[in-house]
Structures are given as C-alpha cells and as structure tokens.
C-alpha cells in the first residue's frame, strides 16, 4: 500500500486499530471510529495526518450541523448587501460561494485527512445526506452550475460517541472499529508518550488508583485517559507524597466531574 499507518510518536495505536486504518485506506472507504470519551478517537486523525505527512481538515459536527454546511455556503445576505451599495462584481455569484470542510478536502491540491468529528451529534438524516458525496467524491453547486470533484480522494475518518444509532445505509459504506479502553500495559505506554520523565512510584500508584476508580460500577462518569494525564501532571507539579495517592486520591476533582461520583469513591476509601 502507498500509505501505511504504523502509529506516530505522539499516539499509541493497537495493532487492530492500525489494521483498521490501513484497510480503510486500501479500500478507499471512510473509517468510522467509536469508543468511550477519552479513548483517542479525535487524536487518531491527527496521528494519521502526522504519520503520513498530510494536511488535516477537521469538520466538527454540532446538533445544528447540516450536510450542506460541509459542501458549501452561498452568502446571499452579503450579495444583497453589496448590491444595495453598488459594489462591483455583484453578478459574479462565485464570489459569494464559500466551500465547507468537505469542499476544502475535495479541492485540495494534495491528498488530505478529513476528520468528521462526532457525527452522531447531528440529526439522524445527516449521515445519509453525505452518502452520495462520500461515494462519488463530488457535489454540484446549482448557483454556479459547477461540479466540484475531488482532485485526490481524502482519507476520511469519522468519529462517534454512540449518542445515536447511525443509519444502516451509512454503516455499510464504512470500515468500523471500536477503540477499547486501554488496559494498564497500553495505558503505561500512552502516559510515557506525554511525559519525558515520570517518577515510577508515582506512575504505579496513580495507575492503581485510576483503574480502581474505573472498576467501581456505581461511578457514572468514569475518568478518561486525558484526565489521567492531567492528574499525573497535577501530582507531579505539587510534589505530593506518593503514599497518599491510593489512600486519599488527592485532587480527585481532576479525575471525577460529578459530585455523586466523588462521594462514591470517597466513601469507598473510608472503609
């Protein structure tokens, strides 16, 4: 394969994840990534772009996002404003067409990585509305009677937090991979990527406390990898006595963001 992803210096990818990325690229299909928050779904696209030396274009999906937003926007208000004030060139509609993120990816002179982030935040029709464009790698702008065709097929990575079920027709067109939460061995590798040097005792105690919290079924919002990184950084900066880490879990608010979860863990520690 021309492009092969083998991870990057800033991203620890499992062999299964690397295979999924490479298969999606070889088959020229979007890669749909699911996993709980903090498992590195968004960072994967950054890592692929970095490893392959390609530009990254990010389309962050919101609840109000429509598929049309990713193609282009016709600024009819600006055109009307210009026409009222006699601005020259108002008849050139192309001046008022702004490409969206998908349009940018199609128009790029070199292949890019396109991240469609948190696709499930939009309404249920959003993924289906993208099927034609992602299949055919083109779209039509009726205002200018122009067809935008991809100069180079982008590497498309789509993330989902599983807030909504995605349409079957959309799923059939994707390569799917679920990122499992890292086990302790893989998590240790991830932590070492973020720190040039970390005290071994501090790391061992922090990992022990972190996975203990995650093992408590009644904790509703379990801490993620990014919160563990922040917590270890806080422990280092304050020079906390490492013997306190598993007994008290200092700065617990870095790990847990719900009062109920903090109370649950603190009750367990007092037993």
Spell out what each predicted region is:
Residues 1-271:
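C-terminal regulatory/interaction module of P-loop NTP-utilizing enzymes
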């Amino acid at each position: 394969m021309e492009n092969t992803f083998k991870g990057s210096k800033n991203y620890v990818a499992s062999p299964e994840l690397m295979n999924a990325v490479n298969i999606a690229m070889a088959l020229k299909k979007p890669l749909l990534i699911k996993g709980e928050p903090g498992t590195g779904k968004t960072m994967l696209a950054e890592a692929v772009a970095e490893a392959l030396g390609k530009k990254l274009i990010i389309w962050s999906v919101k609840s109000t996002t429509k598929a049309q937003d990713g193609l282009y926007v016709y600024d009819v208000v600006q055109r009307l404003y210009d026409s009222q004030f006699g601005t020259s060139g108002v008849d050139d509609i192309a001046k008022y067409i702004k490409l969206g993120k998908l349009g940018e990816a199609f128009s790029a002179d070199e292949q890019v990585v396109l991240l469609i982030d948190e696709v499930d935040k939009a309404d249920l029709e959003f993924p289906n509305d993208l099927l034609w464009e992602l299949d055919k790698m083109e779209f039509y702008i009726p205002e200018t009677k122009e067809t935008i065709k991809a100069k180079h097929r982008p590497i498309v990575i789509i993330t989902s937090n599983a807030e909504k079920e995605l349409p079957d027709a959309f799923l059939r067109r994707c390569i799917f991979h679920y990122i499992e939460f890292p086990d302790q061995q893989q998590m240790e590798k991830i932590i070492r990527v973020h720190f040039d040097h970390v005290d071994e005792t501090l790391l061992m105690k922090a990992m022990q406390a972190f996975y203990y919290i995650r093992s408590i079924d009644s904790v509703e919002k379990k801490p993620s990898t990014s919160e563990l990184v922040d917590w270890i950084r806080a422990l280092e900066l304050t020079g906390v006595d490492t013997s306190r880490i598993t007994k008290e879990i200092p700065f617990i608010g870095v790990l847990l963001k719900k009062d109920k979860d903090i109370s649950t863990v603190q009750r367990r520690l007092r037993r």
